[in-house]
Each structure stands twice: as C-alpha cells, then as structure tokens.
Regions:
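Non-catalytic peripheral regions of nucleotide-handling enzymes
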Residues: 1-80
Length: 80
C-alpha cells in the first residue's frame, strides 16, 4: 500500500559521510537511492522541474523530489 501525500511537506536531504540522510518531522533517516528520474514540464501556469528519488531506509520506503525551480526538497509518497 502507498500513501500519496496531498501536501508535499518540505524535508531536509544531506549527504553525510558517504550516506544520504533524509530529515522529516524531526527524524533523521539514512537512506539508499533505489531509482531516480527527472520530470520537466511547462504547464499553463507554472513550470515543473523536479528530480525524483525512490529511497529506502531502515523504517520506510519513500518517494522524494528536489524542486529545481524552488530549490527545495519534498516528500511526495510513503510506501508501506
């Protein structure tokens, strides 16, 4: 089962000592990247330019993205 989050909360992503670390809701989670892809589209209103990453950690599997327009990281989906 997967939970698509209606609002995509901003998260922190760091590269720490050879490990990718995601911080969300006060929790630091070391993760590995399973897959990545880029989406670039121009909608009638605002352009979308995102780098998506499917990541797995000790406690969850998630879909995160880097919004290249805003310069921020977000959590889009959690997998159970």
């Amino acid at each position: 089962m997967t939970r698509l989050l209606r609002a995509h909360p901003e998260i922190s992503v760091e590269y720490d000592d050879g490990q990718l670390v995601v911080t969300w809701s006060g929790r630091r989670e070391p993760v590995e990247v399973c897959n990545r892809w880029r989406v670039e589209e121009s909608w009638w209103r605002e352009p979308i330019a995102r780098d998506y990453f499917k990541v797995v950690g000790p406690h969850w599997l998630a879909l995160i993205y880097f919004d290249r327009v805003a310069g921020s990281w977000h959590l889009e989906r959690l997998y159970d």
